[in-house]
Structure formats: structure tokens, C-alpha cells
């Protein structure tokens, strides 16, 4: 900044002009459009099938920490990765938050669905204006489907043993 003022004060000095040019050519770091600051992390819970996920959302750069692993390390399947990032992509906040999650129970698909619900709920607490977009996309609806219980007298939930008339 001092070089720029010297160049303005003394236009005959060629060294000051090149210094001013160097200052103006310095790259400007991209600042996110909206900066989020919370008193404490946003905490939500998502559930699907037998999976339960506790999500912590903090302002950051878009990193995922799932049981101490990265998103790619925990969910190698690209379909699950897309499913999880969908709420962030919908509201265009992929690089605005870091997500820390504790996942337990169920399998990969159930955990991915539970994580998606937890992230969507956390995004609403961070920015209530995003609720209509997330609701329209169906990210706020808890999937009620679960495994039906096995009944006695049957082999599975609905499969009956073979019936013989005689």
C-alpha cells in the first residue's frame, strides 16, 4: 500500500510505478459469497432403516469427516457420494461447510440416506431460507421404509411354507 501512495506522490520515480503495478497484479483470494459464523456447531440427527447418523456442521471448506475418514474413504461408491452431497449441491453450499459425522448401525445405503437427511436438517438451521428448495427436492422427508418383521408360522416376513392339499 505504501508503494502505491509513493507512486501517486512522485510520478517521476519509475521504481515506484513498477512497485505499484506489482501490488495491483497480486492475486485476490476468492471470498465465499456468504460467510457463516455460529456460536457453536449445528448438530442434527438423521435416520434411515437401522442407521443413525449424528451430524455436526461447521463453517469451512467442504471437508467431510465420517468416523475419522474422508467421504471417499468411507463411501467408495460414487452413487452414495452423490446422494450425500445432493442437499449441499441443491442450495449451492458445497464449499461453505465442513461436516463431521458419527455413523452407526445399518449398511452403506442406510447410512448414506441417514447422512443426507442429517445434512439437510443442519442446512435449514444454518439458513432457514433454503427450506423450500430442500423440501421440494425431498431431502427433509424421513424415509419410513424399514424391514418388516418375521412372523411365527412363516419362513420370512410373508413367505409361507409350501401348502399341500393332500
Swiss-Prot record:
Keywords: Ribonucleoprotein, Ribosomal protein. It comes from the Bacteria. GO terms for biological process: translation. Disulfide bonds: none annotated. One of its GO terms (cellular component) is small ribosomal subunit. NCBIfam families: PRK00132.1. Signal peptide: none annotated. Residues 142-151 have a biased composition (Basic and acidic residues). GO terms for molecular function: RNA binding; structural constituent of ribosome. The keyword Lipid biosynthesis does not apply. SUPFAM superfamilies: Ribosomal protein S5 domain 2-like. This is Small ribosomal subunit protein uS9. Belongs to the universal ribosomal protein uS9 family. HAMAP family: Ribosomal_uS9_B. Residues 152-166 have a biased composition (Basic residues). Pfam families: Ribosomal_S9. Residues 135-166 are annotated as: Disordered. InterPro entries: Ribosomal_Su5_D2-typ_SF (IPR020568), Ribosomal_uS9 (IPR000754), Ribosomal_uS9_bac/plastid (IPR023035), Ribosomal_uS9_CS (IPR020574), Ribsml_uS5_D2-typ_fold_subgr (IPR014721).
